[in-house]
Every structure is written in structure tokens, then in C-alpha cells.
From Swiss-Prot:
Signal peptide: 1-23
Keywords recorded for this protein, A-Z: Glycoprotein, Secreted, Signal
GO cellular component annotations of the record: extracellular region
Protein name as annotated: Uncharacterized protein DDB_G0275255
Residues carrying sugar: N74, N101, N132, N285
Subcellular location(s) of the protein: Secreted
Superkingdom field: Eukaryota
Length: 289
């Protein structure tokens, strides 16, 4: 009886998760696409410079004139050559400028690849990940659902292996790990290959905007002499838990960030008021200095 109930619970979750990641919970016409761009020159409009390719399929690519993005996104990181780093969820529609001979793309969600991933392999596919509810006393534990985007197919895996902690200095591993497995819309898309229960990610695509929620406003504390305001940083890169901390002895070394990343710091409670440094992707919103 208990075994059958667990099987029913797992099956129900699985069906829900496949529906969620396929985009059919929004509109049946919504699919995930990789974007490409070429700076072609045309003598007569319209002049579509973008193409989209439906993920995990062999369908023919489509030419796109314009993208219609949701409000609140920094479009300078999304258009032109930058668009080659995007995955978009949405649907095509007739162009507002040339309805009879051009196509626009109405974007529901947009994801951008983290710089300095690994070179993609011929076996890589695109996945999103969920928790299947399995709990184990030993590891590895097969508790991760890897759902193939645009395809009603999935695999159960035990490990998500990211390349970025090796490739990028001072990356916030808590921030990245929090995006691997989510129950909301804000999880990452992983391009990778599954073997023996492990997916080796070549590139991760981050949901935009990031963070997806507004950081909380913090009170301004009055600290006694010899103390200063310090913080922690949560999985959304927001400063939290302000407190007065006695000054510590700080090192003077300041790290350099890899290309595509910017240096940020904050007075850390963990480091007794000394600055804690991270290298955040340049395309995410700043949450502090």
C-alpha cells in the first residue's frame, strides 16, 4: 500500500514537472529555442538578422526580425551579437512592421549562458531539473529529474556537475547551486551529457532577470566605535542579516575576475568586517557595490 502510494506520488510529480518545463503550462505554442545572429546587410526591408533553432530537435531554423521581450530586462545584453548566448521560451507571430513577410518572436522567458563554460560536445542536450522526492541514507542518491526540453522525455540522475567552479575564480557557488534544482520558474537550463547517473554540464543558462525578486531593504544600524555594519549574502546575491561587528584585521589583496565577470564586495560578518569578494556575471543585475 505504502509502496503504491509512493509510486503514485512520484508519477504525479513527474507528469507535472514535464508539463512545467515543456512550457505547455503557459501556452501550447511556447517552446524553447537557441538564438543565433548574423550582421547581414539587406538592400530591401525586411532584413531579419536572427535565427532560432528549437532545442533538442532537428527542426529547420526560423528567421526572426524582432524579439519582443518582457519588461524589466536590460536589452543591451540580449540583442545583436549578445543574442548568441540566449535561450528563449516563447512563440512566433507575424511581424508588427511587416506582417505578411516577416516573423517576430514573443518571449515569455529568457535565459543567458554563463561565460567560460566548457566546449559543447556532440552528445549534449538541454535539460531542466527537479527533485523527485527520493531521500537516501547514502550517496549518490537518484533524486534528480532531468527533463529534456521540448520533448516529453526524462531521466533520473544523482549528480549535476558544473564546470564553473574550476573555470571561474571567486564565483558564488551558493548562488549557482541554488539554480540547479528549483520548484519555481527560476531554475537554470543545463546543456550537458548524462552518463552513469551524472550530467556533465558544458554550459548553464541563467533565468533573467537575476535576481528574479527585489532584494529586501535593510535597516541602517548605529554601531558603537570600533564596530561597523556587516552583512551576509543569500542565494539571490542579496545582502541580508545586517549587524554591528567589531573590526578585524583585513588582508589587502584584491582578486581579479575572469572575462565576462565583475568584481563585487561587501563588509562580511563572517570575516569580521573585512570585504568578501565575488565575481558575478556582468549580465546580472547589481545587488550591491
Amino acid at each position: 500500500m505504502i509502496k503504491n502510494y509512493k509510486l503514485l506520488l512520484f508519477t504525479t510529480f513527474t507528469l507535472f514537472f514535464i508539463t512545467f518545463v515543456s512550457g505547455s503550462s503557459i501556452l501550447k505554442a511556447n517552446f524553447y529555442y537557441k538564438v543565433d545572429w548574423e550582421n547581414v546587410q539587406c538592400f530591401v526591408p525586411p532584413c531579419p538578422k536572427y535565427t532560432i533553432q528549437k532545442l533538442n530537435t532537428n527542426e529547420k531554423s526560423q528567421k526572426i526580425l524582432d524579439f519582443i521581450f518582457p519588461n524589466g530586462l536590460n536589452k543591451t545584453t540580449l540583442l545583436g551579437d549578445e543574442s548568441k548566448t540566449l535561450i528563449v521560451l516563447g512563440t512566433t507571430q507575424p511581424s508588427s512592421k511587416f506582417p505578411n513577410n516577416a516573423t517576430d518572436f514573443l518571449v515569455t522567458r529568457v535565459y543567458k549562458s554563463l561565460p567560460l563554460g566548457n566546449k559543447q560536445t556532440s552528445t549534449d542536450k538541454y535539460y531542466m531539473f527537479g527533485d523527485n522526492g527520493t531521500r537516501c541514507k547514502t550517496s549518490p542518491c537518484p533524486n534528480i529529474v532531468a527533463a529534456l526540453l521540448n520533448v516529453h522525455s526524462q531521466e533520473i540522475i544523482n549528480t549535476i556537475s558544473q564546470p564553473y567552479e574550476k573555470n571561474v575564480g571567486f564565483l558564488d557557488s551558493v548562488w549557482l547551486s541554488s539554480k540547479n534544482i528549483r520548484s519555481d520558474d527560476f531554475g537554470l537550463i543545463g546543456q550537458g551529457t548524462i552518463k552513469n547517473g551524472v550530467i556533465s554540464i558544458s554550459n548553464s543558462f541563467i533565468y533573467l532577470p537575476d535576481p528574479p525578486i527585489k532584494c529586501p531593504e535593510l535597516p541602517l544600524l548605529k554601531c558603537v566605535e570600533g564596530n561597523s555594519m556587516t552583512y551576509s549574502r543569500d542565494e539571490n546575491r542579496c545582502l541580508v542579516s545586517p549587524r554591528c561587528t567589531k573590526f578585524g584585521v583585513c588582508t589587502l589583496s584584491i582578486p581579479l575576475c575572469n572575462k565576462g565577470y565583475r568584481l563585487v564586495s561587501f563588509p562580511s560578518t563572517e570575516l569580521n568586517g573585512c570585504p568578501k569578494f565575488f565575481c558575478d556575471p556582468e549580465f546580472v543585475n547589481k545587488t550591491h557595490k
